Curated annotation (Swiss-Prot):
Stated family: Belongs to the metal hydrolase YfiT family.
Pfam families listed in its UniProt record: DinB_2 (PF12867)
Entry protein name: Putative metal-dependent hydrolase BCG9842_B2589
Any one GO CC term of the record: cytoplasm
Record keywords, A-Z: Cytoplasm, Hydrolase, Metal-binding, Zinc
Cofactor note: Binds 1 zinc ion per subunit.
GO molecular function, one term: zinc ion binding
Function: Possible metal-dependent hydrolase.
Annotated Zn(2+) binding sites: 65, 156, 160
InterPro entries membership: DinB-like, DinB/YfiT-like, Put_metal_dep_hydrolase_YfiT
Subcellular locations according to the entry: Cytoplasm
Main localization category: cytoplasm
Length: 173
């Protein structure tokens, strides 16, 4: 593994996006709370406060970041479903990771992630084909279709889970 920042590679997807791809991605989003919980199982406080790479976030910060990011994504989906191509508000994830709540026990975020994903997955399974074409506009990255955003956030969860599992493997935890 050459680039510790991208243990599963960067987000890519095949075009056209198929119904099977959407179903797989939604399943990955549904599975994330369990997979992330499994990835940190039995880690002690010192391990949770270990960066996954030099200059990177700690395992604890990664867990809290996933929840911060997925809360933002859930809201973006709701905005896109109720408004025409809304412009969403970006946030400074690196600064959020330094806020005091990122030092809380990881269980706080794991409970939030589980509840959030129950609601989000319920919403995702309710989407019609035409809903997948709806978009939101990110001021920095432009217009994103919900179909692509589903794939992106499925990847995002696997990406950060892999930060933790690859660290565990490298350090023999």
């Amino acid at each position: 593994m050459n680039d510790l920042r991208y243990p599963i590679g960067q987000f890519t997807y095949k075009r056209p996006i198929t119904e099977e791809m959407i179903d797989t991605w939604i399943q990955e989003i549904e599975d994330l709370p369990h997979e992330l919980t499994k990835a940190i199982k039995d880690l002690d406080q010192k391990q949770l406060d270990t960066p996954y790479r030099v200059g990177g976030w700690t395992v604890r910060q990664v867990v809290h970041h996933v929840v911060d990011s997925h809360m933002n994504s859930y809201i973006r989906f709701k905005l896109a479903l109720t408004e025409k191509n809304p412009t969403i508000k970006p946030y400074k994830e690196e600064k959020w990771a330094e806020l005091p709540d990122s030092k809380l026990p990881v269980d706080v975020s794991l409970v939030m992630l589980d509840s959030l994903h129950k609601r989000w997955v319920n919403l995702l399974y309710s989407l019609e084909i035409e809903d997948l074409e709806k978009t939101f506009n990110h001021p920095e990255t432009g217009e994103t279709k919900l179909a692509v955003a589903i794939g992106l956030y499925a990847w995002h969860g696997r990406h950060h889970t892999a930060h933790i599992t690859s660290l565990r493997k490298r350090l023999n935890w």
